[in-house]
């Protein structure tokens, strides 16, 4: 057993510094990941307030699906990825999973572990998803939101934890449970949805899936997908909504041309 290092301060008190250990995990999604970043436009509105719309602006189509699709993403990736996700999503999931994991508490997870990096890299091709959502106002006003959806995705996380308060087995169990009980992104399992689930890469087949996504659905693929949005073939609602807004754009363009 390695002896603990003891620090003696000026008052003669001995303090045993906490020992930290890091462990890295490769993760693959078991359900699609839906992005939920707040757009820069929305952030500016919060900062400066919404300007009163002109008569011309009131006549504009309410939503711009292509713009909202891109704005929903976190674009801070590196090491071969373009997309990313806040690392706090992983930690929050682990803390929530602690409620269903014997021997640990949510408070101890919040204090004793740290997911390295502000963002984690995400590999996977984003598709445009349009769906009905409910606003958080008192009336739960319905609206259409366009977001990036990754049917297949993977990431890699490094967790730093206090040792011996936690063991590598504890961290592994928490991450496994977080992927099962919580997930990442919008409409995730924790919030009653079916999205965002994940598991740790543990088998050769899992490793093949991870390697393929990193190789084929990295930065180049992701940039092209954001520049040229596609909708999944089976996503009938998104196809119908996008067709409706496309026809409305053509109709308005024709009216403007006639007036000119």
Predicted regions mapped to residue ranges:
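RNA-interacting cores
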Residues: 1-260
